[in-house]
Amino acid sequence: MDLSGTRLLKANRATVWAHLNDADTLRAAIPGCETLTGSSEEGFEAVVKQKVGPVKATFKGKVTLSDITPAESYTIAGEGTGGVAGFAKGGAKVWLSDNEGGTELSYTMEAKVGGKLAQLGGRIIDSFARKMADQFFDNFQEQIDGPLDPETDADASPAA
């Protein structure tokens, strides 16, 4: 499953970059994240609870950042196991660029699952991945810009 999208943020690039590397911001942005500890330099440990179709799981895993060009781009990769539910892993390439009065955040991401999760079928997994990506970037944008206004932020929706 591959996804891509763009978000227009009101903050300048330095502020957005700082939030992309901040454990508290990422914890608040990741749907279902119970804990996220660590640093962008050493990597993060995470515990995330999710329900995908009929499968509920608590995933424990690691998130790492690589290919870092400060205030411009990085690659974020994560992998977690959820016991009998299986595993999930994925990554995203994130780019920042200046935009009138703010910052444009662009991303491409991919996700893979195994175990019981993989048995749910591609449509359920694809739909879930899109929902999680949308929710992550909505939450991230709210951490920086404040609550989203559906009318004025309509141009900030992801492209599939």
Can you name each region flagged by the protein language model?
Residues T37-E79, Q135:
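Glycine-rich portal/gate segments that line the openings of hydrophobic small-molecule binding cavities
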Residues M1-K51, G146, A156-A160:
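Hydrophobic ligand-binding cavity/cleft-lining segments
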Residues A23, C33, K62, G114-L117:
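A short, glycine- and basic residue-enriched loop/turn
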Residues G114-A159:
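A conserved amphipathic terminal alpha-helix motif
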Residues V16, L20, L26, L65, ...:
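Hydrophobic pocket/interface hotspot
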Residues G5-R7, E34, K60-D67, G90-D98:
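Hydrophobic/aromatic beta-strand elements that line small-molecule binding cavities or substrate pockets
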Residues D2-T6, G43, T58-K60, S73, ...:
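Intrinsic-disorder/low-complexity, polar/charged segments enriched in Ser/Thr/Lys/Arg/Asp/Glu/Gln
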Residues G80-S127:
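Beta-strand/loop substructures that line and gate deep hydrophobic ligand-binding cavities in soluble
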